[in-house]
């Protein structure tokens, strides 16, 4: 644990395979301890700032519960809760918070912002999500897959279907490369990840005995998968023309029963970082249905509610894995 002490957690690419495996094993240990009532608080008297430029359910709750379980105090600063970027630079905010807090979580837009916080705060900074990356999510995704499939990480065939450029796709590809997984990214060519990231991940995968395949061929991409993973196709705030174009591009890549069957694996599981547009029972879901006639977007309700779906176990594991990151980088042993 000592080797991660005072480290920031900004992207999985900053960590070795052994370090990521350590965080996942620690997550298992902390989860087990919580379940059987033997958890020992290792963050006593630590003060943690949660800096959110984007609202969240799972990330905020996971950090707050994990910190509480471990004896830490938390201050939540929401989208209107600080002056960062408005009256105060990120560099200045970092130095202010670093003088008062032992650790800082950031969830927002730019990867450069979380990097600046880490550079100038003098305390561990944890990336709760940026437009480019989502490393804490991937720890939960991998832990869930191992728990359900009963396989070593390197033996898991992990497939992401959808927008290959988004933060979750980027983070999953990084994590899979580090862990030596067989990773398929199934997406339209127009939505491929950057060549720079893809080439870097392919090199890392080769070093760790893994493999990365990028394809727009759904049959080829999903065959043999242990995990089918998807994420939302569009984000609120994007212009209407982007929605229309994205929906047309991604409609064939909807995760449905036919796609799950194409894996040829009766034990395949479905993962999603949530929230999901699997029906029209939300305000945004209803707006999408009224405007585009689509009731189910990236995944059908049938798959989302099926036995193959492990999305709520995955959501719970956000808390256990985030706890592991905080304990490993800030804990007292």
UniProtKB/Swiss-Prot annotation:
Record keywords: Amino-acid biosynthesis, Arginine biosynthesis, Cytoplasm, Transferase
Pathway given in the UniProt record: Amino-acid biosynthesis; L-arginine biosynthesis; L-arginine from L-ornithine and carbamoyl phosphate: step 1/3
Enzyme's top EC category: transferase
Record localization: Cytoplasm
GO molecular function: amino acid binding; ornithine carbamoyltransferase activity
Keyword Transferase found: yes
GO cellular component terms given for this protein: cytoplasm
Annotated function: Reversibly catalyzes the transfer of the carbamoyl group from carbamoyl phosphate (CP) to the N(epsilon) atom of ornithine (ORN) to produce L-citrulline.
Similarity comment text for this entry: Belongs to the aspartate/ornithine carbamoyltransferase superfamily. OTCase family.
Official protein name in the record: Ornithine carbamoyltransferase
The species this protein was found in: Staphylococcus aureus (strain Mu50 / ATCC 700699)
């Amino acid at each position: 644990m000592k080797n991660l002490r005072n480290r920031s957690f900004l992207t999985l690419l900053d960590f070795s395979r052994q370090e990521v495996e350590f965080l996942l094993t620690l997550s298992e240990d902390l989860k087990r301890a919580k379940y059987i009532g033997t958890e020992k608080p290792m963050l006593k008297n630590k003060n943690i700032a949660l800096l959110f430029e984007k609202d969240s359910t799972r990330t905020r709750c996971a950090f707050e519960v994990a910190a509480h379980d471990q004896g830490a105090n938390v201050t939540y600063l929401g989208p209107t809760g600080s002056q960062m970027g408005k009256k105060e630079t990120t560099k200045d905010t970092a130095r202010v918070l670093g003088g008062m807090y032992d650790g800082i979580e950031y969830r927002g837009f730019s990867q450069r912002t979380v990097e600046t916080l880490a550079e100038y705060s003098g305390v561990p900074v944890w990336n709760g999500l940026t437009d480019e990356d989502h490393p804490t999510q991937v720890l939960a995704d991998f832990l869930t897959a191992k728990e359900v499939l009963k396989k070593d990480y390197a033996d898991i065939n992990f497939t992401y279907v959808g927008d290959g450029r988004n933060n979750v796709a980027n983070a999953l590809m990084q994590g899979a490369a580090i862990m030596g997984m067989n990773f398929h990214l199934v997406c339209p060519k127009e939505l491929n990840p950057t060549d720079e990231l893809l080439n870097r991940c392919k090199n890392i995968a080769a070093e760790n005995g893994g493999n990365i395949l990028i394809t727009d061929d759904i049959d080829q991409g999903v065959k043999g998968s242990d995990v089918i993973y998807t994420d939302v196709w569009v984000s609120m705030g994007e212009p209407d023309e982007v929605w229309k174009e994205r929906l047309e591009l991604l409609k064939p890549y909807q995760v449905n029963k036919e796609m799950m069957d194409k894996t040829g694996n009766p034990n395949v599981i479905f993962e999603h970082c949530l929230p999901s547009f699997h029906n029209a029972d939300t305000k945004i879901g209803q707006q999408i249905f009224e405007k585009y006639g689509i009731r189910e977007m990236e995944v059908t309700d049938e798959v989302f509610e099926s036995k193959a779906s492990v999305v709520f176990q995955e959501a719970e594991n956000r808390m256990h894995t985030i706890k592991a990151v905080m304990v490993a980088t800030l804990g007292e042993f």
